[in-house]
């Protein structure tokens, strides 16, 4: 039987949602190598999201690198698969050495059919496979193990200190006995954003229905927060460390968000959700358990110029080649999103958040 005392796991990407989705895979690997010490190559957010405090999260120095103009210009010429392969020996040398390196980044780039399935088509193209399923299947084949469907579902554990923060937040803002909706408009990719006007309308309609809204912000006094305030919204801004964000999110009755890390967080906390998609396919990169929410894909029939969208914004830049001043997200109607919110809010939440006693967690640093 294959043995290893030290294992490095390289997630398939370095976003918040990517780390959340990698956790069930890491758990499966730990079951296969129960005596091994595990390290994950990820940015600081990993320390605030990792469920297992025995797993070390280390940030490679390359993650601090901001590419210059020349690097950005050359990037389309460098095969992403090659860059993913080099991550293995590079991170092993910097962070290790390790007995075993499990490079999910390379497996993902090598095997996923991004050209066909990354950007959702209208009508949908059958045959899409979720990234988590693809990687779990690869691990099963390589290590001769079984990862059941239930074991593949991402779970996020709320830490005790964060739970206390959320309890105080609820009391301070008089949210007890209220229906609370989390709004997640922020993403670092402009092409995935829904229009600000649509967000303001959705917020107003939800509040008119008697719900309280929380505006999850990626920075203090963000432009979105200022726009909400200028519109007279009473949405409560949320900006805190990621473990606290998870605790606040876990108490919400619904999360509405674009394809970003906090949407995956909601799914991993069993918070009912409505996901807004345009250039990315919910069947490939959306929350894993689709039974917990509704994925809405912008009803924009893709043009020939959309054929390379997966490559343009995933590897090159952040612009739509088809719509000059926006993206297909602008075709997603607020009325459709509101109707989905009403539908999901009618459902009873079936699973409470997971909590663990305090032990061995790093101090909270950084924020969403």
Sequence positions of predicted segments:
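Catalytic machinery of carbohydrate-active enzymes
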Residues: 1-368
């Amino acid at each position: 039987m294959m043995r290893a005392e030290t294992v490095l796991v390289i997630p398939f990407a370095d976003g918040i949602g990517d780390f959340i989705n990698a956790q069930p895979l890491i758990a499966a690997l730990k079951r296969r190598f129960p005596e091994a010490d595990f390290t994950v190559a990820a940015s600081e957010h990993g320390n605030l999201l990792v469920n297992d405090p025995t797993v070390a999260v280390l940030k490679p120095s390359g993650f601090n690198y901001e590419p210059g103009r020349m690097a950005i210009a050359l990037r389309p010429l460098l095969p992403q698969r090659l860059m993913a392969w080099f991550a293995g020996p590079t991170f092993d040398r910097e962070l290790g050495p390790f007995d075993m390196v499990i490079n999910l980044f390379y497996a993902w780039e090598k095997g996923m059919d991004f050209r066909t399935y990354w950007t959702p088509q209208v009508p949908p193209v059958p045959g899409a496979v979720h990234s988590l399923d693809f990687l779990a299947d690869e691990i099963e084949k390589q290590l001769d193990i079984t990862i059941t469907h239930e074991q593949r579902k991402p779970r996020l554990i709320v830490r005790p200190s964060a739970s206390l923060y959320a309890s105080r937040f609820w009391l301070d803002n008089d949210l007890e006995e209220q229906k609370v909706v989390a709004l997640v408009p922020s993403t670092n990719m402009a092409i995935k954003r829904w229009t600000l006007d649509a967000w303001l309308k959705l917020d107003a309609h939800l509040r008119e229905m008697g719900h309280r809204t929380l505006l999850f912000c990626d920075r203090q006094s963000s432009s979105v927060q200022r726009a909400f305030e200028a519109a007279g919204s009473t949405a409560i801004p949320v900006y805190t460390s990621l473990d606290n964000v998870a605790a606040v999110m876990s108490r919400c009755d619904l999360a509405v968000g674009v394809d970003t890390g906090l949407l995956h967080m909601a799914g991993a906390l069993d918070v009912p959700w409505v996901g807004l998609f345009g250039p990315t396919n919910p069947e490939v990169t959306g929350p894993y358990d689709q039974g917990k929410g509704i994925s809405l894909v912008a009803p924009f029939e893709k043009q020939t110029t959309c054929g390379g969208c997966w490559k343009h914004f995933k590897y090159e830049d952040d612009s739509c080649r088809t719509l000059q001043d926006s993206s297909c997200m602008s075709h997603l109607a607020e009325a459709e999103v509101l109707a989905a919110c009403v539908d999901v809010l009618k459902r009873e939440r079936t699973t409470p958040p997971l909590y663990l006693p305090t032990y061995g967690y790093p101090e909270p640093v950084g924020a969403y």
